From Swiss-Prot:
Gene responsible for this protein: argH
PANTHER family in the cross-refs: ARGININOSUCCINATE LYASE
Known pathway: Amino-acid biosynthesis; L-arginine biosynthesis; L-arginine from L-ornithine and carbamoyl phosphate: step 3/3
UniProt name for this protein: Argininosuccinate lyase
Taxonomic source organism: Paracidovorax citrulli (strain AAC00-1) (Acidovorax citrulli)
Any one GO biological process: L-arginine biosynthetic process
EC identifiers of the protein: 4.3.2.1
NCBIfam families: argH
GO cellular component: cytosol
Entry keyword Cytoplasm: yes
Amino acid sequence: MSSSPTAQPSQDQLATKAQAWSALFSEPMSDLVKRYTSSVFFDKRLWQADIAGSLAHADMLAAQGIISADDHAAIRRGMATITQEIESGAFEWKLDLEDVHLNIEARLTQLVGDAGKRLHTGRSRNDQVATDVRLWLRGEIDMIADLLKELQRSLVDVAEQNVEVILPGFTHLQVAQPVSFAHHMLAYVEMFARDAERMQDVRRRTNVLPLGSAALAGTTYPLDRERVARTLGMEGVCQNSLDAVSDRDFAIEFTAAASLCMVHVSRLSEELIIWMSQNFGFIRIADRFTTGSSIMPQKKNPDVPELARGKTGRVVGHLMGLITLMKGQPLAYNKDNQEDKEPLFDTVDTLKDTLRIFAEMVGGQRDPATGRKEGGITVNPQAMEQAAQKGYATATDLADYLVKKGLPFRDAHETVAHAVKAATSHGVDLSELPLTVLQGFHPAIGKDVFDALSLRGSLNARNTLGGTAPAQVRTQLARHRARLG
């Protein structure tokens, strides 16, 4: 086969050239492919991270003598103009330019000429986008940390007001033992505290710099990657260029942490939904967080917790999607990774919105004048106590009472089961059985048994670290207040 000289591009081809990589190609990209492959209309939210990364890269290029001081100054001026244009809404995002990176670079070149073309020296979009996503996610994690704190504070606020309120504790959704309502709220504080810790762990591994890895193999330019990392406030640089540009485990790890957080929200949602129902009547949710029915005028529906429960499935689905996205990719970068952004962005948005609305729904809205919160969940102590009383919640306390009288626990367990059966047949609580009837189950039972059988006595008796006794709950409240500020 004979070879021929390289064909020169026609004027039509030059006129239709839009992509930064078009010189090799003999025809422009089809409009269908442009629409299919473009990401600019969802990844443009990375613009601040993209500009920050570019400025840090330009600073380093100038310091290393790779670009001139004049080019460096021009790049900084151009980026300042672009920032103003984006913030004001004047910036024109173009589908032809594919993504946030090329849109900004094209505008920079339009503003400052060849200096804009020199900005991309020593980098690829592969390491550029990995850097942008890490910078963006770092900032979002910091906002999520604040929102998690606010939700915990709301739960602590509610707990402080309800230390002495008795709630039936459930296992298998059946009454088990009485607990302080505050103790129950603090269980969620513990969960969200662990969620915050996980987010900080994710942040540490996210806050590492890929920039300088170029397409996959590093670069021939004498880059100072550590300088760029310091400028961007990152804790170090990725040590392997292939890994740096190709993996999205930090995004997967974040989405896993977000999924766990949403699972905790979903569990709280389930309880709020149950407690609000007429069959329980334990709490009331403020009207502004409920909706009505188009046909049933009596309805107040807990749409917010129901939606949060549903959105949890959405976030968990994003986690599965991201894991599946990565599982079959050979090293290094593949276009598949463009699909990491929409699930990641939606996970962040969903989690932030959910935490924000739950903090207000549970704890109320802070009055700027007084600093107090108003309009959170309203607790019905009478309904809670009645439910605990009806469910033989102090049966375990009677067993413990008999153990202290010398019975082996298994014998005490069996004895109390017979007592519960008798109380059930008479439609009364254990504490309402006459002493003589109780003594018929075991002669060691004395008058002091009624202290053990009272809900208040049961609560106070669990005065061990982590227990539900009011004294222990107040200790935990003080710990959380000090931690949350």
